[in-house]
């Protein structure tokens, strides 16, 4: 059969549209079979190079994302990024192709279900080279109880690091063969 186009909110699609995942739409089951490479990705690969990707460092203390590899300290909490987790070759997947799945039992579905390791990160917007963040605190007689940081223009990024049960937990993502 042919492929079927399904649309999902991006945050949901990240966990639903992983390789070989089952997706339910209008009472039918579909299996993710391939990634649709954006036209800009095809252009970049025309000369035999790789998909256009980015790297990120994630602060071990607060979870802030640093796509700018030049900073030595976290833009959110100020901690040195020496212990930050680095994830290389991030590629933003816009669409996937699915095919109708064969009928399967609930037991087969549970056996085939794939759990992905997802991580949510953030980046504060910068204004004049300074994070555009408002901070509010609450304290009692013993000191700080709560400190809240709010950035109206923060960028939230969700990363699918791969299967939770992958063999090597230090290797992230999936192979893409366009």
Question: Locations of the language-model features?
Answer:
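Generic detector of short alpha-helix boundary/capping microenvironments
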Residues: 8, 47-50, 139-142
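Inter-lobe coupling/hinge segments of SF2-like helicase ATPases
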Residues: 39-40, 44-60, 67-68
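Short, Lys/Arg- and Gly-enriched loop/turn segments at beta-strand edges
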Residues: 29-42
């Amino acid at each position: 059969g042919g492929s079927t186009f399904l649309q999902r909110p991006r945050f949901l699609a990240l966990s639903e549209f992983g390789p070989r995942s089952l997706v339910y739409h209008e009472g039918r089951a579909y299996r993710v079979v391939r990634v649709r490479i954006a036209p800009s990705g095809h252009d970049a690969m025309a000369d035999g190079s790789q998909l256009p990707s980015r790297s990120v460092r994630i602060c071990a203390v607060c979870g802030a994302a640093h796509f700018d590899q030049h900073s030595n300290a976290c833009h959110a909490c100020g901690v040195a990024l020496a212990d930050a987790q680095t994830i290389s070759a991030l590629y933003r997947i816009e669409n996937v192709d699915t095919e109708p799945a064969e009928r399967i039992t609930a037991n087969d579905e549970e056996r085939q279900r794939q759990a992905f390791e997802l991580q949510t990160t953030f980046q504060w917007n910068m204004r004049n080279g300074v994070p555009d963040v408002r901070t509010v605190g609450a304290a009692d007689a013993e000191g700080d109880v709560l400190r809240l940081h709010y950035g109206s223009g923060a960028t939230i990024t969700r990363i699918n690091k791969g299967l939770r049960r992958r063999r090597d937990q230090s290797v992230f993502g999936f192979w893409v063969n366009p």
